[in-house]
Swiss-Prot record:
HAMAP family: NDP_kinase. Its EC number is 2.7.4.6. This is Nucleoside diphosphate kinase. GO terms for molecular function: ATP binding; metal ion binding; nucleoside diphosphate kinase activity. The active site is at residue 115. The gene is ndk. It comes from Nostoc punctiforme (strain ATCC 29133 / PCC 73102). Its main location: cytoplasm. It catalyses: a 2'-deoxyribonucleoside 5'-diphosphate + ATP = a 2'-deoxyribonucleoside 5'-triphosphate + ADP; a ribonucleoside 5'-diphosphate + ATP = a ribonucleoside 5'-triphosphate + ADP. Belongs to the NDK family. One of its GO terms (cellular component) is cytoplasm. It is an enzyme of class 2 (transferase). Homotetramer. The keyword Nucleotide-binding applies. Major role in the synthesis of nucleoside triphosphates other than ATP. The ATP gamma phosphate is transferred to the NDP beta phosphate via a ping-pong mechanism, using a phosphorylated active-site intermediate.
Length: 149
C-alpha cells in the first residue's frame, strides 16, 4: 500500500485548521499510520528542504517552518501521493481550485498551510527523515474492504 508524508505547517496549526485538514484525508478513505506534533529543529528543516538550499527563499523557509509547531503525518492508501496533492491544491493558494485545502484556506505562497510529498520516492525519503519505523502503525480500519476492490 502506498504511503505519503504530509506536514501541517505553522500557519495551519496557529489558525486552528489541524482537525479540518485531517478530516479531509480521513473522509477520502486514507488511513493515518503516523502522527507527530513537534517543534521542528533547524537541522531537520534544512534536511527536509535541502533541495532548495541554493534558492533565495531557503533561509526564510527554514525560519518559518521552525517558528511554531507542525503536525507531521504519514497516510496510507491506493494512489495516496497523487490524491493528496489534489486535495492540497496548487502551491500558490491564489491559483488553487476551490475545494482544495489551499484554495479554501490558503492566503499566499509563503503561508500555504501544508506540505505534501510530490512523488512516491520522495514520500519514502521524507517518511524516513521524519519518522522511525516503530513510530508507524500498521493497521486497517474496519471500513477498508468497503473502499478497495
Amino acid at each position: 500500500m502506498e504511503r505519503t508524508f504530509l506536514a501541517i505547517k505553522p500557519d495551519g496549526v496557529q489558525r486552528g485548521l489541524v482537525g479540518e485538514i485531517i478530516r479531509r484525508f480521513e473522509t477520502k478513505g486514507f488511513t493515518l499510520v503516523g502522527l507527530k506534533f513537534l517543534k521542528v529543529s533547524k537541522e531537520l528543516a534544512e534536511q527536509h528542504y535541502g533541495v532548495h538550499r541554493e534558492r533565495p527563499f531557503f533561509g526564510s523557509l527554514v525560519e518559518f517552518i521552525t517558528s511554531s509547531p507542525v503536525v507531521a503525518m504519514v497516510w496510507e492508501g491506493d494512489g495516496v501521493v497523487a490524491s493528496a496533492r489534489k486535495i492540497i491544491g496548487a502551491t500558490n493558494p491564489l491559483t488553487s481550485e476551490p475545494g482544495t485545502i489551499r484554495g479554501d484556506f490558503g492566503i499566499n505562497i509563503g503561508r500555504n498551510l501544508i506540505h505534501g510529498s510530490d512523488a512516491p520516492e520522495t514520500a519514502q525519503q521524507e517518511i524516513a527523515l521524519w519518522f522511525k519505523d516503530e513510530e508507524l502503525v500498521n493497521w486497517q480500519p474496519h471500513i477498508t474492504p468497503w473502499l478497495h476492490e
